């Protein structure tokens, strides 16, 4: 299948995955003060409306936790583009959040679901980092493959699928699908490597 078709198909899988990744409230140590917002407690508990959180963020744009909560509201509303932007901002303004593994996965999933192609490379980088911290987590594995395919990082996708195979029952349909995927990815990785060699020749 074409790369374009593969990317479109990613959205369906990632839409399901992001529900799992972002399900439940985001708990973060060291809740910030929200004195400017009358319903501060609701925001801190994740119960405020998207509008209330957005209004609060205008007065506290560096509150990473609030950006994450705002992203969750946007995910619930199906606005993955806004969610991706909010999560990216959260990571930029709050170093602790930038290191949060679940936020890394949420960001990657939101970018892929929104088909923010300009951010595919960044999403792949972030998800790759998360995978390095939680390689045995099925969410990280699946999203790492999806992000690598979206970013056309074929060699990395091959590495992840190869690592997954030993943990899949060899007589299962999932194993056969994984093997077929691996063959496809290996072919694309080889083609990309050959193309790169051609480009560097004088």
Predicted ranges, named:
Residues 91-92, 149, 154-172, 180-183:
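TPR/TPR-like (Sel1-like) alpha-helical repeat modules
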Residues 111-120, 152-159, 183-202:
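Alpha-helical linker/edge segments of TPR/alpha-solenoid repeat scaffolds
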Residues 36-41, 72-76, 81-84, 88-133, ...:
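Alpha-helical adaptor scaffolds
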Residues 66, 99-103, 140, 174-178:
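TPR alpha-solenoid repeat register
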Residues 1-51, 55:
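Long, contiguous interaction/recruitment modules in multidomain scaffold/adaptor proteins
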Residues 61-62, 95-98, 135, 169-170:
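Short coil turns that delineate tetratricopeptide repeat
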């Amino acid at each position: 299948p074409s790369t374009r078709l593969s990317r479109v198909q990613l959205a369906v899988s990632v839409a399901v995955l992001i529900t799992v990744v972002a399900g439940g409230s985001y708990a973060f140590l060291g809740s910030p003060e929200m004195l400017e917002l009358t319903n501060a407690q609701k925001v801190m508990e994740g119960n405020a409306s998207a509008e209330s959180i957005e209004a609060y963020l205008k007065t506290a744009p560096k509150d990473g936790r609030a950006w994450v909560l705002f992203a969750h509201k946007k995910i619930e509303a199906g606005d993955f583009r806004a969610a991706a932007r909010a999560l990216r901002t959260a990571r930029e303004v709050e170093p602790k959040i930038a290191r949060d593994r679940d936020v890394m996965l949420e960001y990657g999933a939101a970018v892929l679901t929104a088909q923010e192609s300009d951010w595919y490379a960044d999403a792949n980088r972030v998800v790759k980092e998360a995978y390095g911290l939680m390689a045995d987590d099925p969410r990280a594995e699946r999203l790492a493959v999806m992000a690598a395919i979206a970013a056309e990082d074929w060699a990395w996708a091959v590495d992840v699928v190869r690592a997954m195979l030993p943990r899949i029952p060899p007589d299962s349909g999932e194993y056969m699908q994984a093997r077929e995927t691996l063959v496809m990815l290996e072919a694309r990785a080889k083609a990309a490597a050959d193309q790169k060699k051609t480009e560097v020749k004088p």
